Amino acid sequence: HRRADNSVCASDLCLAAAERLISDLKWEKESIDCLIFVSQTPDYILPATSAILQDRLGLSTHCYTLDISLGCSGWVYALSVISSLMSSGHMKRGLLLAGDTILKMASDKDKSSYPLFGDAGSATALEYTALEKSNMRRR
């Protein structure tokens, strides 16, 4: 498993993943409408890590940000939240960032759970596309 340096936070890992993803997609940062950050190891209690990432990524101050503190189900939960936000028609592009530096809190002496965890950050891009009526089917 991977262990981040003690000076590295979850936002550092997600920042690197997000910058690469935005570059690969050739997205303008101003076009990103929401950023949701999922972690059990946020950088701070306050301010929200999503707001820190919004600033570090250079996103618009109009970009909606939200932290979600969940473990295994966090990514799926955040996907549901972004999907709901986008289906309202007010948001087109979003970033789902998930990261943890959990090994700072884990003991390598705990042989039952320590091997299950690692430090990582991920970035997922989502873009809303309306379906034409002719492409929709009812069941």
Regions found by a protein language model. Give the residues of each.
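Conserved active-site "lid/cap" helical segment
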Residues: H1-D33
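Condensing-enzyme catalytic core mediating Claisen C-C bond formation in acyl metabolism
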Residues: H1-V8, D110-R139
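Conserved catalytic cysteine-centered active-site region
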Residues: D5-D12, Q40-R93
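Structural signature of cysteine-dependent C-C bond-forming condensing enzymes
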Residues: S23-D33, L59-Y64, M86-L96, D100, ...
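Short glycine-rich or small-residue beta-strand-to-loop segments that form or flank ligand, phosphate
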Residues: C34-Q40
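Short beta-strand segments
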Residues: V38, S69, G94-D100, L126
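Flexible, glycine-rich active-site loops centered on histidine and acidic residues
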Residues: G89-A120
